[in-house]
Amino acid sequence: MNATPQDYRHLDVGPLLGNDSGMNDLLYVNGGNPLSGTITVRGAKNFVSKAMVASLLGETKSVLRNVPQIRDVAVVSGLLSLHGVQVEYSAADGVINLDPSAVESAHVAEIDAHAGSSRIPILFCGPLLHRLGEAFIPDLGGCHIGDRPIDFHLEILRRFGAEVDKREGGIHLRALGRLKGIKMELPYPSVGATEQLLLTAVRAEGITELSNAAIEPEIVDLICVLQKMGAIISVDTDRVIRIEGVDRLTGFTHTALGDRIEAASWASAALATGGDVTIKGAHQVEMMAFLNTFRKVGGQFEVHDQDIRFWHPGGPLRSIVLETDVHPGFMTDWQQPLVVALTQATGLSIVHETVYEKRFGFTCALRKMGANIQIYRECLGGAPCRFGQRNFHHSAVISGPTPLHAADVEVPDLRGGFSYLIAALAANGRSTVRGISLIDRGYEAFQEKLEALGADVSRG
Ligand code: EPZ
């Protein structure tokens, strides 16, 4: 069975095709119930989509396990299918089979229609340049949490020997002969740029060395996939990654690491609602920075082999000073859900966002719901970051505890959207959360999970 939009049964087909209808795109949330029970998180969105792209580099079939049924998987499946990859997905088993033996160029208009709201298309560059000698990458979507330029990506591709031609609607790339290994230092340890380099270097001629690389667990898992395919990659402790290019790669069989962002989101929901949630598929090693912070705020957790239990022990939560950072720091994607829980902590919490310059826009709606949050341009509470001199509102001071009340809110971005669900669950009264199809991008069956945890929610 080919992965078609119909396979993503609980998802709207419209958003998959970049055609939001707005129908039934809201959730009513009757707040006040502590979340309680057990849920499962499957593979990490920010790994699964990249591993799917990596399959393009192999000459044989790949099998990826623990794949969640989320819209980003649907978007990448669509793009791979357009390029001649046979994609078969069983949502129940979470297994995706990818056969790239008949890869071909796709029509520009179709690529555009399937790119949806994702940023993953930019990672098709290296694999397509190796397979076809050219690529067309549509203008990217993704969450509006900063400018999110792709200058590092384009610089990497140019240095490998690709001709990069910006056109209306996207970028056309052409390989001028076989791509050749490079030595490069990233200005910032960008996740996407590191992945771009990995997916390009593995089949380039000679050695590539990247300094100041990102080393997020999802990247390490991608390196494991590439090693299974036949790549030679070493990761040093000082953020240096070395790749020896090889002529051929095969397919892989791999089980995706769990989604630590989804796990932390549910943990924050447990804390904000005074609940007790066990998350199967959450792993300590990838969440250590989150677990430390969760404990400092006053939440409790218990790590088991297959799950982590998170709960609010009763009594007041504590305010904290927090700075987001690249791995092994506190992830930016954990920030938004946790901020909702911090509205319930006693005293002043300070959160300094150092990864994205505009990731506090979501706090407007929280203020509407009764939270006391002020946003500042200065780097508060930590070392100065690269946004300090640039006039961005990237520090927040949260004063609590403040009771939250119901409101009518519109999802601004993926993690901000989940944060609104948490706020609505913690609030008194019935909230309306609009634009929830955006949450489908990264949270598998979130309504079913909410219901399983005792939340009183219904679709509009
Ligand atoms: C990935 O985005 C994730 N997305 C993001 O998750 C995550 O927040 C981010 O990494 C950081 O962990 C996916 O994996 C699909 P970056 P990415 O390149 O790769 C700047 C979520 O909610 N930068 O590490 O796009 C950039 O502007 C999403 O799941 C450049 O300046 O992030 C940002 O400030 C949101 N030029 C910083 O680097 C470039 O060419 C980090 O971005 C590239 C990045």
Regions found by a protein language model. Give the residues of each.
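Short, structured segments at the rim of ligand-binding sites
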Residues: 2-460
